[in-house]
């Protein structure tokens, strides 16, 4: 037991002496005084905070821009669908009126009405799909830029 006490005592003394020697060496070999070192660390912390604030502001601005783009594209789709629906309804009414005035050509008029309605629906579908792809591309670009800002 006395050996364990001596080993612990020797270890504590060695640790204390080693700490004092290390601290003294660090003070003598430091390239700057403590005040200069604290000032440099403070200025670097301020610069880092400013850079972080700028990156946060940029990310918020880009996010706002992409939300605006998505809203514009969505409103364009809505307007496009409304316009196409109105055109289809007008064509249907026109063809119905024509078929009423000319009973002999009613089957032809119905066929024309179907074809025009299908054509208008296809056009609307194509435009909506294209706008959807545009929005998807814009969102991918936004995501890439957000990832770059996070690096």
From Swiss-Prot:
Provenance organism: Bacillus subtilis (strain 168)
UniProt gene name: ytxH
Pfam families membership: YtxH
Similarity comment: To C.plantagineum desiccation-related protein clone PCC3-06.
Name of the protein in question: Uncharacterized protein YtxH
Top-level lineage group: Bacteria
InterPro entries per record: Desiccation-related_membrane (IPR052928), YtxH (IPR024623)
Coiled-coil annotated residue ranges, if any: none
Bias (Basic and acidic residues) ranges: 91-105, 112-151
Region entry Disordered, spans: 89-151
């Amino acid at each position: 037991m006395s050996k364990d006490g001596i080993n612990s005592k020797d270890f504590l003394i060695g640790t204390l002496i080693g700490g004092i020697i290390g601290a003294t060496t660090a003070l003598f070999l430091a390239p700057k005084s403590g005040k200069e070192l604290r000032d440099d660390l403070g200025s670097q912390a301020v610069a880092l905070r400013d850079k972080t604030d700028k990156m946060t502001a940029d990310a918020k601005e880009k996010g706002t821009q992409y939300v605006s783009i998505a809203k514009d594209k969505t409103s364009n789709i809505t307007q496009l669908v409304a316009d196409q629906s109105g055109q289809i309804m007008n064509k249907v009414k026109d063809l119905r009126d024509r078929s009423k005035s000319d009973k002999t050509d009613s089957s032809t008029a119905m066929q024309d009405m179907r074809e025009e309605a299908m054509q208008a629906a296809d056009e609307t579908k194509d435009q909506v799909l294209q706008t959807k792809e545009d929005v998807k591309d814009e969102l991918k670009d936004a995501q890439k830029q957000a990832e770059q800002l996070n690096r």
